[in-house]
């Protein structure tokens, strides 16, 4: 299947499958039409409004079974992730009942842990499973204390104010004595640690300059390592789906959109943007080349740098080569990043002469020395002097959760916290409520090397000795780097417990698996738009729990009961009482804002989203506008109160892999350091048809799989040199592992780099019989490096990786990860 016209193919698919064609969208009829126009001979049919990370969904139920789903609010660009509710509910991949690994059941806590992932499974009753979980956790806590239990449980799970599996797990852990948690995440591991030193805020999860300001004032927007058409289909809560509308409006205005990326992304194609191909993991040299040109031509804003930044002079010495003997000229940069020197110089001229918004993505900081990318982007924006002006400066979240969509005036619903009975107050999802924690991306290193000491953001951390792992709502055997090392790491704990909907790779690596409901089998609430907060969505139960699945909340209530802390855990509230309390938090806030909201009972009965409007101030809001207007009255949260291009705090940490100013430090593996054995760079972008690994098991897989494998994008010249044709099954291998994939030969990837989307389910062949078992399905992280970005952030760095690719010869093994695992008869 050719990939050059990927958007056209997707649009054709959408035309064939959209609920608009079938007679269903809320604005065009999803809630109203299906239920009211059903012909008399049809069985009873109803439409239930719910929501997911991928938006508000109308679900058609007939005779108690889901028959169709689609958007409850018609999006600007169709979102087929909303069409597979039935696949999720009735999948053969579901965990249908409590299961225990055979060897573990025979010898709980003392089993042969090397059998994880390849042992048979035994069906047990819920009481037996819950007793086993309780007894194992109690044993570990009694023998090793709270630092023996890891319950960080990172993952996207499901949106919802109550049924947030990780929060519910940690609430239970806090009620029973504590746990080991984590610091940071896999999305922005490097940036969220360095940005507070530079800007005084985490920045990556902050509201952006309003899109209304962008439309009015920006001349150029630059999508730097960002693919919003893919990443804005989802949100941490539920996507408001408005960001892409603004991109389309900007395109319609005729203004310039530039995409700097190793791949010609779906966004770049849809917007017909200018594509500047750049070698993977070389964004910093490109930025330095632009910055050097600005100085060379006297186009950097000296007044802005003097008034609003700190330490620029020290950085300029590095930029001009006074400290290391290497001026960071456009010609120097071109040799590294692959962008011609003349193009680099023209970018400098264009950015300096036009109101430019640099929209930085997160993929470029998921590399060795990833702290440098966003630090350098902020430095470049500072040199342009447009920060705090309408339509100018930089933004690090325009591609995520529809950043920049104006924040509505209304109310924000409450949510369950990880601290029972109100202790420690409400926490955000980034806050850690554990008694000890380590940088999340070091999880395999922690399990393998208890007691090891590492540096993290100026402090020394000692790894705990983890004896029990409890994961609910995550899939580390897809999202963590160097999967084969993770397999060994997960053999270290005495017990691994997983709450899961499906037989994911992580569930298969556990000892005890408890079947959890999907969000369509329970009641909940969520907001639309992590930044816009423009709607409250009901998440109404569509069908009862399927098979023997239980809500995560109910699972932890049962465990809390066994631990004698049920009342503390539930606070005496039922599911609907919790939801009414959360809704009333928004009701009270809306009343204070003089915005009308119906009472909870009426809202719930109406079966539709409740929306708020943004005020004029929100539409005109400019990030750092107040700081620019008066930096003395509105200082940043840095030691100087200014943008810290040079950070004394970071410099004094004396790290050799993160200096006091942004700089280029060559990683061990990247496009400029390939070898004869591994001559290609690998990039692992987000998938279009999944949310990471979620929905990988649905019928959407038929729309992208090549020869029943994850597709790998490869340039025609790289393919021809290896005798690879479009559609061939290929073997990709690195120092760390090997996978099979389906070749997608396309000019939409820079020569010398291949792209394998993250999120394919790990499917090892002959697990336990080889150090590097072949992943039959194409899980990208089998290939990537498990190495911290630097001593500062210790973030994940998958995008500094080199590989080789070859045509697979012989009979390809069957993909089996989407089948039920072996069970004792």
From Swiss-Prot:
Gene Ontology terms, MF aspect: electron transfer activity; molybdenum ion binding; molybdopterin cofactor binding; trimethylamine-N-oxide reductase (cytochrome c) activity
Binding site for Mo-bis(molybdopterin guanine dinucleotide): 187
Record GO cellular component, one term: outer membrane-bounded periplasmic space
UniProt EC number: 1.7.2.3
Necessary cofactors: Mo-bis(molybdopterin guanine dinucleotide)
Family: Belongs to the prokaryotic molybdopterin-containing oxidoreductase family.
Name listed for the protein in its UniProt record: Trimethylamine-N-oxide reductase
């Amino acid at each position: 299947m050719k990939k050059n016209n990927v958007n056209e193919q997707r649009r054709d698919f959408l035309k064939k499958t959209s609920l608009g064609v079938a007679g269903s969208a809320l604005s065009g009829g999803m809630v109203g039409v299906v239920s009211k126009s059903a012909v008399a001979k049809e069985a009873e049919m109803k439409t239930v409004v719910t929501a997911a990370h991928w938006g508000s969904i109308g679900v058609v139920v007939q005779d108690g079974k889901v028959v169709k789903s689609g958007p409850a609010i018609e999006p600007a660009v169709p979102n087929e992730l909303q069409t597979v509710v039935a696949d999720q509910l009735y999948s053969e991949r579901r965990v249908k009942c409590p299961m225990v690994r055979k060897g573990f059941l025979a010898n709980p806590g003392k089993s042969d842990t090397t059998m994880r992932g390849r042992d048979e499974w035994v069906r047990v009753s819920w009481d037996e499973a819950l007793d086993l979980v309780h007894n194992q956790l109690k044993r570990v806590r009694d023998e090793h204390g709270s630092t023996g239990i890891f319950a960080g449980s990172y993952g996207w799970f499901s949106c919802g104010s109550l049924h947030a599996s990780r929060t519910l797990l940690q609430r239970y852990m806090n009620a029973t004595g504590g746990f080991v948690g984590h610091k940071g995440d896999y999305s922005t591991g490097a940036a969220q640690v360095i940005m507070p030193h530079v800007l005084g805020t985490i920045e990556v999860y902050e509201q952006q300059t309003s899109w209304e300001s962008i439309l009015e004032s920006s001349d150029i927007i630059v999508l730097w390592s960002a693919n919003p058409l893919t990443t804005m289909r989802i949100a941490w809560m539920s996507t408001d789906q408005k960001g892409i509308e603004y991109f389309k409006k900007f395109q319609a205005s005729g203004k310039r959109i530039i995409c700097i990326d190793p791949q010609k992304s779906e966004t770049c194609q849809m917007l017909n943007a200018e594509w500047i191909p750049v070698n993977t993991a070389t964004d910093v040299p490109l930025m330095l080349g632009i910055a050097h040109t600005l100085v060379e031509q006297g186009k950097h804003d000296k007044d802005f740098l003097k008034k609003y930044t700190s330490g620029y002079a020290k950085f300029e010495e590095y930029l001009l080569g006074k400290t290391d003997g290497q001026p960071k000229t456009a010609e120097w940069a071109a040799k590294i990043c692959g962008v011609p020197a003349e193009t680099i110089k023209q970018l400098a001229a264009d950015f300096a002469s036009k109101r430019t918004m640099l929209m930085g993505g997160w993929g470029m900081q998921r590399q060795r020395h990833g702290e440098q990318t966003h630090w350098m982007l902020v430095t470049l924006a500072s040199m342009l002097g447009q920060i705090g002006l309408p339509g100018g400066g930089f933004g690090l979240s325009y591609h995520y959760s529809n950043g920049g969509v104006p924040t509505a005036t209304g109310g924000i619903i409450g949510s369950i916290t990880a601290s029972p009975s109100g202790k420690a107050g409400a926490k955000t999802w980034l806050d850690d409520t554990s008694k000890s924690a380590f940088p999340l991306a070091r999880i395999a290193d922690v399990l393998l090397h208890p007691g090891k000491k590492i540096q993290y953001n100026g402090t020394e951390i000692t790894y705990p000795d983890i004896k029990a792992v409890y994961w609910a709502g995550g899939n580390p055997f897809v999202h963590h780097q160097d999967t084969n090392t993770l397999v060994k790491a997960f053999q270290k704990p005495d017990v691994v417990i997983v709450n899961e909907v499906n037989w994911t790779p992580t569930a298969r690596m556990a000892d005890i698996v408890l079947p959890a409901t999907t969000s369509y089998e329970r009641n909940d609430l969520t907001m639309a738009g992590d930044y816009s907060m423009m709607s409250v969505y009901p998440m109404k139960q569509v069908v009862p729990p399927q098979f023997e699945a239980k809500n995560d909340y109910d699972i932890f209530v049962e465990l809390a009961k066994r631990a004698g802390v049920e009342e503390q855990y539930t606070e005496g509230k039922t599911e609907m009482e919790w939801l009414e309390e959360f809704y009333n938090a928004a009701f009270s806030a809306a009343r204070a804002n003089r915005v009308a909201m119906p009472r909870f009972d009426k809202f719930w009965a109406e079966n539709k989203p409740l929306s708020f409007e943004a005020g004029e101030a929100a539409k005109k809001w400019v990030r750092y506008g107040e700081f620019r207007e008066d930096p003395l009255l509105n200082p940043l949260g840095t030691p100087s109160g200014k943008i810290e291009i040079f950070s004394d705090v970071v410099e004094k940490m004396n790290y050799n892999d993160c200096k006091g100013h942004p700089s280029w430090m060559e990683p061990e593996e990247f496009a400029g350091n390939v070898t004869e054995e591994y001559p290609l760079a690998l990039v692992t972008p987000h998938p279009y048809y999944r949310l990471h690994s979620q929905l990988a098991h649905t019928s959407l897989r038929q729309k992208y799989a090549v020869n029943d494998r994850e597709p790998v994008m490869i340039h025609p010249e790289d393919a021809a040199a290896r005798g690879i044709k479009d559609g061939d099954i290929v073997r990709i291998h690195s120092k760390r592992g090997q996978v099979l994939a389906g070749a997608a030969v396309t000019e939409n990837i820079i020569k010398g780099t291949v792209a394998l989307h993250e999120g394919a389910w790990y499917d090892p062949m002959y697990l336990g019989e080889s150090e590097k078992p072949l992943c039959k399905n194409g899980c990208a992280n089998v290939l990537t490096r498990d190495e911290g970005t630097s001593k500062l952030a210790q973030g994940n760095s998958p995008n500094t990786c080199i590989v080789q690719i070859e045509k697979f010869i012989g009979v390809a093994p069957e993909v089996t990860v989407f089948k039920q695992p072996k069970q004792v008869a």
